[in-house]
C-alpha cells in the first residue's frame, strides 16, 4: 500500500477501525489507491454518517420527543 494512503487511513481513528473491520478495503486500496473517495463513502455508509442517515436520526429523535410530550399531556389530563 502506498505511504500516502497509509497516512490517510492512520490519520483518522474511524478509518483505521473500518479497514480492520472490512479488510477487503485494504486489498482494494493496495491495488487501486485512487479509490479513496469510494472508501470514504463506504465508511460513512457503514457508520451511518451520511446526510440521509443523519436526517433520519434527527427525525427519529423528534418523533421520540413528540411521543414523550403526548405521554406527559395524557398523564396530566388524567389527574
UniProtKB/Swiss-Prot annotation:
Domain of life the protein comes from: Bacteria
Pfam families: YlbE (PF14003)
Name listed for the protein in its UniProt record: Uncharacterized protein YlbE
Native organism: Bacillus subtilis (strain 168)
Gene coding for it: ylbE
